[in-house]
């Protein structure tokens, strides 16, 4: 779905959304369409829709993957209430890209996890939570998360963001991690439990084909060559992208072809920390209610 905005309001003001709000569902402002009038349209995707509960993000080194994840996290943290989303952050490189987000009350334990034992615990707990929620839905006479919320109940969406997934390939726990990720991918949709996998290497021996199948939203940035592009998105073409920060999203439900878009640029870590601190320093005492805002800056050509 595309959002109509004005050039003067680009990225840094409240937008006219038609009937969409970033505070609802699990919406991600992907960026501008890369076409003759891309300054007029913003592409927003909603992972709360049944068709795209999980996502895969891939690129070469420096291709724009981590920048995109930062923009995604910032928009969720700044637009969604604390009680509406639980963020679990995992990064095989230790989480330096995401340190600025750890003060946000949405982030589980205010940590970004790297240790394999912690990762397995997070994934096991997510699967148990899926089973628990399904029992809760039965008791409430609801078929799924959406119906449960529509009945007036409260429940947070749980989102696991797992960056640098391929770094665990070859470790003693890799098969366990992959098995538990697969379970979440196949059962989490109806329970409001989502997982986003990001990696530079998406060969079939790294990322199981069944996991890929259950991640219909695929966002690919600059790749090294045609085979790298096919590993990430199932299509050639990502190797032709010339600019960092320009991504292609494949398999979006708006058509059967890919959509090329220009991503937003993440603010600096200092700016992110300031925004999060200013909004949530008193969140336990006073509920902060603000209009939705796209957070990010226009990438330079």
Where are these regions (language model features)?
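Short, glycine/acidic-rich hinge or "gate" loops at secondary-structure transitions
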Residues: 138-148
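Small-molecule kinase domains that catalyze NTP-dependent phosphoryl transfer to phosphate-bearing small molecules
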Residues: 245-255
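Short acidic, Gly/Pro-enriched loop/turn segments at secondary-structure junctions
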Residues: 227-229
């Amino acid at each position: 779905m595309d959002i109509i905005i004005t050039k003067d309001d680009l990225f840094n003001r409240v937008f006219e959304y038609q009937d969409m709000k970033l505070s609802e569902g699990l919406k991600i402002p992907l960026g501008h369409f890369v076409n003759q009038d891309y300054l007029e349209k913003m592409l927003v995707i909603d992972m709360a829709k049944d068709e795209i509960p999980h996502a895969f993000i891939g690129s070469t080194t420096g291709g724009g993957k981590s920048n995109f994840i930062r923009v995604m996290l910032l928009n969720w943290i700044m637009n969604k209430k604390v009680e509406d989303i639980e963020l679990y952050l995992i990064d095989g490189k230790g989480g330096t890209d995401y340190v600025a987000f750890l003060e946000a009350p949405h982030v589980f334990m205010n940590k970004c996890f790297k240790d394999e034992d912690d990762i397995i615990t997070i994934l096991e707990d997510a699967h148990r939570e899926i089973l628990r929620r399904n029992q809760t839905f039965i008791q409430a006479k609801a078929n799924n998360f959406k119906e449960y919320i529509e009945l007036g109940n409260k429940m947070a969406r749980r989102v696991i963001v797992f960056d640098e997934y391929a770094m665990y390939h070859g470790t003693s726990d890799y098969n366990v991690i992959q098995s538990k990720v697969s379970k979440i991918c196949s059962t989490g949709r109806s329970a409001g439990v989502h997982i986003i996998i990001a990696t530079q290497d998406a060969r079939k021996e790294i990322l199981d084909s069944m996991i890929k199948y259950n991640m219909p939203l695929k966002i690919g940035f600059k790749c090294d060559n045609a085979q790298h592009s096919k590993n990430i998105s199932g299509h050639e073409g990502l190797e032709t992208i010339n600019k960092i920060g320009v991504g292609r999203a494949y398999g979006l439900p708006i058509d059967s072809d890919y959509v090329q878009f220009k991503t937003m640029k993440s603010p600096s870590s200092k700016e992110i920390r300031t925004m999060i601190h200013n909004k949530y320093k008193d969140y336990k005492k006073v509920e902060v209610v603000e209009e939705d805002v796209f957070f990010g800056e226009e990438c330079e050509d």
